[in-house]
Amino acid sequence: MTMTNDPVVIMKQEVGKAAASRVKSDSIVGLGTGSTTAYAIEYIGERLKSGDLKNIVGVTTSFQAEVLARKYGIPLTTLDVIDRIDVAIDGADEVDPNKNLIKGGGAAHTQEKIVDSLAEVFIVVVDSNKLVDKLGSTFLLPVEVIPKAVTPVMRQLEQLGGKPELRMGVRKAGPVVTDQGNLVIDVKFEGIDDPATLEKTINNIPGVLENGLFVGVTDIVLVGEIIDGKPSVREIC
């Protein structure tokens, strides 16, 4: 891994390494999206190169993850040709005490949900500031929507008590476009009391492909922290 003196970067590296160390030979691995997950992908590649890990294939959740996996020499497959995923590693934008998540800051939550929900073991890697008492406390809820349905979907999200905004690109003109060619609406809720019900309700709105609530799918959360100036990793099961 890249050498650095930045304790935050070192902490993310340690969390990624802790997750990657749980990958076993002869397995199919879901490879998620995000800065911490990127270190897990890198370390899986290092284990393959050293011979510590053998005969694995990855299933990626985004174009970003695919690029990283290929960079680090991880063989890839697709959901069309496999019937299981042994372990998936992914990040999150918020994690509540029940290990429910908000994901989608990278606009990849639809593919992430497909891969993560199929995994026998789903490991979430985060830093401690992603832990919240209630989902929606600090992060907007992403909703992927087909382009023609943006306006009616936004109206229905408002009726649910949300404040929706179309996500715009940072280094491009116009809105963010997902890997599926759709748009993303970010919705502010003043705390989500019942994430399971809200997840289903939003997904039943015509024009919505998927939203960023992940309910009841997480097995393990690996949390990176800086204690007394030093990085550490703790596990929530």
From Swiss-Prot:
<dbReference type="GO" id="GO:0005829">
    <property type="term" value="C:cytosol"/>
</dbReference>
<feature type="binding site">
    <location>
        <position position="130"/>
    </location>
    <ligand>
        <name>substrate</name>
    </ligand>
</feature>
<feature type="binding site">
    <location>
        <begin position="103"/>
        <end position="106"/>
    </location>
    <ligand>
        <name>substrate</name>
    </ligand>
</feature>
<dbReference type="InterPro" id="IPR020672">
    <property type="entry name" value="Ribose5P_isomerase_typA_subgr"/>
</dbReference>
<feature type="binding site">
    <location>
        <begin position="33"/>
        <end position="36"/>
    </location>
    <ligand>
        <name>substrate</name>
    </ligand>
</feature>
<dbReference type="Pfam" id="PF06026">
    <property type="entry name" value="Rib_5-P_isom_A"/>
</dbReference>
<dbReference type="InterPro" id="IPR004788">
    <property type="entry name" value="Ribose5P_isomerase_type_A"/>
</dbReference>
<keyword id="KW-0413">Isomerase</keyword>
<dbReference type="InterPro" id="IPR037171">
    <property type="entry name" value="NagB/RpiA_transferase-like"/>
</dbReference>
<feature type="binding site">
    <location>
        <begin position="90"/>
        <end position="93"/>
    </location>
    <ligand>
        <name>substrate</name>
    </ligand>
</feature>
<dbReference type="GO" id="GO:0009052">
    <property type="term" value="P:pentose-phosphate shunt, non-oxidative branch"/>
</dbReference>
<comment type="function">
    <text>Catalyzes the reversible conversion of ribose-5-phosphate to ribulose 5-phosphate.</text>
</comment>
<comment type="subunit">
    <text>Homodimer.</text>
</comment>
<comment type="pathway">
    <text>Carbohydrate degradation; pentose phosphate pathway; D-ribose 5-phosphate from D-ribulose 5-phosphate (non-oxidative stage): step 1/1.</text>
</comment>
<protein>
    <recommendedName>
        <fullName>Ribose-5-phosphate isomerase A</fullName>
        <ecNumber>5.3.1.6</ecNumber>
    </recommendedName>
</protein>
<dbReference type="GO" id="GO:0006014">
    <property type="term" value="P:D-ribose metabolic process"/>
</dbReference>
<comment type="similarity">
    <text>Belongs to the ribose 5-phosphate isomerase family.</text>
</comment>
<feature type="active site" description="Proton acceptor">
    <location>
        <position position="112"/>
    </location>
</feature>
<dbReference type="GO" id="GO:0004751">
    <property type="term" value="F:ribose-5-phosphate isomerase activity"/>
</dbReference>
